Amino acid sequence: MTFSEILDRVGSMGRFQFLHVAILGLPILNMANHNLLQIFTAATPVHHCRLPPNASAGPWVIPMGPNGKPERCLRFVHPSNASLPNDTQRSMEPCLDGWVYNSTKDSIVTEWNLVCNSNKLKEMAQSIFMAGILIGGLVLGDLSDRFGRRPILTCSYLLLAASGSGAAFSPTFPVYVVFRFLCGCGISGITLSTVILNVEWVPTRMRAIMSTALGYCYTVGQFILPGLAYAIPQWRWLQLTVSIPFFIFFLSSWWTPESIRWLVLTGKSSKALKILRRVAAFNGKKEEGERLSLEELKLNLQKEISLAKAKYTAADLFRIPMLRRMTFCLSLAWFATGFAYYSLAMGVEEFGVNLYILQIIFGGVDIPAKFITILSLSYLGRHTTQAAALLLAGGAILALTFVPLDLQTVRTVLAVFGKGCLSSSFSCLFLYTSELYPTVIRQTGMGVSNLWTRVGSMLSPLVKITGEVQPFIPNIIYGITALLGGSAALFLPETLNQPLPETIEDLENWSLRAKEPKQEPEVEKASQRIPLQPYGPDLGSS
């Protein structure tokens, strides 16, 4: 008997499982708001220099730019006498008296004047937020192994609620950035624990469906954010609105049970048995739960216990040539996906289309993208799907370089297509990486992969700063990186209908150029298949 069969005995997909997935899914729905929040809280409105004291408005004060609109960062030097020389002979100066913003909505940009020479601080704030997700994954992943999944989940809810609320009351920009960093740490802890607890408590046959449902919670969250931002024009109130629900999630998380596998592996089998019996009673199978014994539970988790005792590190990912090649190619694919994804997801403002409508479109494209991904993974395979997703995304981003700014519709279509391809890439990578790495080192491999996508998402906003040198440079960098990631995926083996490797030595028996996938009995395939997890970019394993 396996743990899956024990799960069947206590209710399989009963009331507990549906409530469990719902409790885990609601925070994910709201987590998308935090992840993409700076699209609206850091929006940069049209602006120009504030007039000097006692100066009258007019073209003799604010010069006109090449586009026929007032310059955003320069003004004419105001003469001390009443005479006004010819515009072509006048010198210009920075906005010494601040700026005037043509918007009824406020943001961190308008409050702290993050424009002109200070506009780099806006991108830096997003990078520091992403750095929080990166550091949180490294620190909280280790703490989760030591103290359990549920305590980390509960503390992460509280951390995100408190730091998000703190950001809403930040008196200065540096304080705001610190709180956003802590928000990133909280998001990482929520992601890590949610994925593990969702997969563990759902039977094998339902994991793909429930994982898909949980993934779509993130997608739905992308629809909610524009509505909230439109209804709440003040960035502080918007920040507070998306943070307060996590205080409620903090309280509800006390109902969430701990990972049974973690309890058994850490010598807390008695507590694990009590939880299983509680779940059985909740599902109307109290008698089945009472018949479970400690010896039976330990016996059926003996394999997990044995694997846990075998300690592997990131260095083992480079032990044999095939594993080294896989790790390099997967790392590049993960980096490219995170790097390019956030170039589009956080660049909604650049396409000259209504910010709220475009964000809804950007969120909506994930729905068909993930559905097409599921079909492609099942019929074309992981290798083809992964390579195609990144290559097409890279091509779309590079094409943006050659489309004039006035062709807004064409640029928007390319951006939406590219974002859909990158969403597809994320969905594929979660499954593909899990299938490629052997069981004994799978968690380590997923952790390293997650690290690289966080590095990519952290560097992505900083690359936008290169646009001040030449506007086309960022898209060139994003596009080429995506193409490199897609090219790297071409060197990975196909895993469709292949048995999952248990040990590192099993990889040495794999043929890199196997043309015909081995057909297996459906029952055997179901027991080996790792479910597709078409989550958002921040719902991966760590």
UniProtKB/Swiss-Prot annotation:
Belongs to the major facilitator (TC 2.A.1) superfamily. Organic cation transporter (TC 2.A.1.19) family. It is a multi-pass membrane protein. This is Organic anion transporter 3. InterPro entries: MFS_dom (IPR020846), MFS_sugar_transport-like (IPR005828), MFS_trans_sf (IPR036259), Orgcat_transp/SVOP (IPR004749), Sugar_transporter_CS (IPR005829). It comes from Macaca fascicularis (Crab-eating macaque). The gene is SLC22A8. Glycans are attached at N86, N102. Keywords: Cell membrane, Detoxification, Glycoprotein, Ion transport, Lipid transport, Membrane, Phosphoprotein, Transmembrane, Transmembrane helix, Transport. Residues 42-123, 180, 234-236, 349-354, 408-411, 493-542 are extracellular. One of its GO terms (biological process) is prostaglandin transport. Residues 514-527 have a biased composition (Basic and acidic residues). Residues 1-20, 145-158, 202-212, 258-327, 376-386, 433-471 are cytoplasmic. It is found in: Basolateral cell membrane. One of its GO terms (cellular component) is apical plasma membrane. It catalyses: estrone 3-sulfate(out) + glutarate(in) = estrone 3-sulfate(in) + glutarate(out); estrone 3-sulfate(in) + 2-oxoglutarate(out) = estrone 3-sulfate(out) + 2-oxoglutarate(in); glutarate(in) + 2-oxoglutarate(out) = glutarate(out) + 2-oxoglutarate(in); urate(in) + 2-oxoglutarate(out) = urate(out) + 2-oxoglutarate(in).
